[in-house]
């Protein structure tokens, strides 16, 4: 099996899914690695630390890859000169080789990884439930759709990082919402205004 990505698509996977994977060696593999699920020239990539899940869909080229094939890869830094990323899967040896190629298709980096036992079926059910929730909200089934500037959301949450939990109070889709500490000993809050959706 061969899987090919343009470098910008593979970088998107690492940028979106990599930062939220767990760095704790005692966590399950599904929380320490990025899951790639392949469907007919589309890759759904998921990253999770057990408390949140990020997902991105990118195009890819598949050769001899069956639908719903799942592969776990570590968060990686992509070399700057990379133009294409190839993954060669050897199911017999239960390993894969990830290669970074430059403009002339010369290999500028290659790394081999072993499969985890139970891959992919043990991991598939975890993301099936997540996908149901992504679909539900993407289809407008959420109670409110609120658009916020991500910089303001991040800075609002930055001040609450020391709290064990936060409580988010919504009024309506056009009213500001309140993010406050769920910890009684720390009385802090932030009010965030929505931005207009076009």
Located regions from the model:
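DNA polymerase processivity clamps
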Residues: 1-198
